[in-house]
Amino acid sequence: ILKSLDLIDNMNDMEQIGVLGLHIEGPNISLEKKGIHNADYIRILSDDMVDRIASSGNKTVKIITMAPEKAQPEHLKKLKGAGIHVSIGHTFAKYSECVSL
């Protein structure tokens, strides 16, 4: 994730070369609903990682997919505050868990 953020952050004209932004899918997803994702990379996002993603803002990161039951509310607020669309995925969360966020 960090390598991708650094690469995209340092591009001068992303649209000219066909990069519209990143969709980060994971690593904050349910292990039981991981799909094709490698279980070794599934983990809770650290404060530092959330700060780094948010600092790139929606110029770089357009969407991040997370499992609500694994997400920390303050992380969601920070990402949404940076203009990043937080999407629900790879989850066993109930409707009530999702709407409470």
Can you say where each PLM-predicted feature lies in the sequence?
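Histidine/acidic-residue-rich, glycine-tolerant segments that coordinate divalent metal ions
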Residues: 1-101
